[in-house]
């Protein structure tokens, strides 16, 4: 078992009807997820709507969830930024608050070259030398790809222990696995690609679908690791319509709508992300019903 486990849930950030943080629902949801297949809770990532949260809101959420789940699950903070100084400050704060690690997204908008990316992540790692860090490559959102050779260099830094790979490029994931030591963990950043990534040496997934099917995802990853690929394939194909429905429009709009259909008062997304339109809600209803999740 890797440090962060097999199933990491990129948790939504619950809001009230007025758009304020809903810490009581966050607490209840975190406990529910920890009890239903989640090894590590990732807070304030893409799914957690980090672009529309203040750092103070994030720090308070870190504390609430850390206290709520106690030892039930690890808690990871999304502390990445396109400002290295800002990322260092946030990552140091997450470490001080007793979290188990941090997720660091590739700097967005300013599009640094590979050497700049290396220096950015190295500087953050050196600022928290005993704090486990996971890189996060999602070029579709950041505008820049973290190349396999750069990942390999970063994997030589002791506390950079994993990567969330959301490029959708199986060749690149294969190359990362080839160039990095076995103890460096690769996680799929896309639920629908988890099984293909496992086939080239990934450890698991940073998941959105695990809000709804965490235990099934655990079963899929465990089956593959235990030499039962057919069982893993059956689960993968069963869950594929759900994975697609959850990304029918910009994440996390669909997963918040799905949770609301299940009775979770997670609120809507903050602007500029709108509420889920009726066709998306109907698609989610049909998909959840087919899986007996409603």
Curated annotation (Swiss-Prot):
Site label Part of a proton relay during catalysis, positions: 46, 109
Described purpose of this protein according to its UniProt entry: Catalyzes the condensation of (S)-aspartate-beta-semialdehyde [(S)-ASA] and pyruvate to 4-hydroxy-tetrahydrodipicolinate (HTPA).
Compartments, as annotated in UniProt: Cytoplasm
Official protein name in the record: 4-hydroxy-tetrahydrodipicolinate synthase
Keywords, in A-Z order: Amino-acid biosynthesis, Cytoplasm, Diaminopimelate biosynthesis, Lyase, Lysine biosynthesis, Schiff base
Residues binding pyruvate, per UniProt: 47, 206
Active-site positions on this chain: 136, 164
The protein's enzyme class: lyase
SMART domains: DHDPS
NCBIfam families: dapA
Protein EC: 4.3.3.7
InterPro entries reported in the protein's UniProt record: Aldolase_TIM, DapA, DapA-like, Schiff_base-form_aldolases_AS
Database matches in PANTHER family: 4-HYDROXY-2-OXOGLUTARATE ALDOLASE, MITOCHONDRIAL, DIHYDRODIPICOLINATE SYNTHASE
Gene: dapA
Catalytic function, reaction form: L-aspartate 4-semialdehyde + pyruvate = (2S,4S)-4-hydroxy-2,3,4,5-tetrahydrodipicolinate + H2O + H(+)
GO biological process terms held by the UniProt record: diaminopimelate biosynthetic process; lysine biosynthetic process via diaminopimelate
């Amino acid at each position: 078992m890797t440090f962060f486990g097999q199933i990491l849930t990129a948790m939504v950030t619950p809001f009230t009807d007025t758009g304020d943080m809903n810490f009581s629902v966050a607490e209840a949801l975190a406990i529910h997820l920890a009890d239903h297949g989640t090894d590590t809770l990732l807070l304030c990532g893409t799914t957690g709507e980090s672009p529309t949260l203040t750092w103070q809101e994030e720090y308070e959420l870190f504390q609430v969830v850390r206290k709520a789940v106690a030892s039930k699950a690890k808690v990871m903070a999304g502390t990445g930024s396109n400002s290295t100084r800002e990322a260092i400050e946030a990552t140091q704060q997450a470490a001080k608050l007793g979290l188990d690690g941090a997720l660091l997204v590739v700097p967005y908008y300013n599009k640094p070259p590979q050497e700049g990316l290396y220096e950015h992540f190295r500087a953050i790692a050196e600022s928290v030398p005993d704090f486990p860090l996971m890189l996060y490559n999602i070029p579709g959102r950041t505008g820049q790809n973290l190349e396999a050779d750069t990942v390999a260099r970063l994997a030589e830094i002791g506390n950079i222990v994993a990567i969330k790979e959301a490029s959708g490029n199986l060749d690149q994931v294969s190359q990362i696995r080839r160039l990095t030591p076995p103890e460096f963990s690769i996680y799929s950043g896309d639920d629908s690609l988890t099984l293909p990534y496992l086939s080239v040496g990934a450890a698991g997934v940073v998941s959105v679908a695990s809000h709804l099917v965490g235990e099934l995802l655990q079963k899929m990853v465990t089956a593959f690791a235990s030499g039962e690929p057919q069982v893993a394939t059956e689960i993968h194909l069963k869950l594929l319509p759900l994975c697609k429905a959850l990304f029918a429009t910009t994440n996390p709009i669909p997963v918040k709508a799905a949770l609301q259909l299940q009775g979770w008062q997670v609120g809507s997304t903050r602007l500029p992300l709108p509420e889920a339109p009726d066709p998306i809600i109907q698609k989610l209803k049909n998909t959840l019903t087919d899986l007996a999740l409603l």
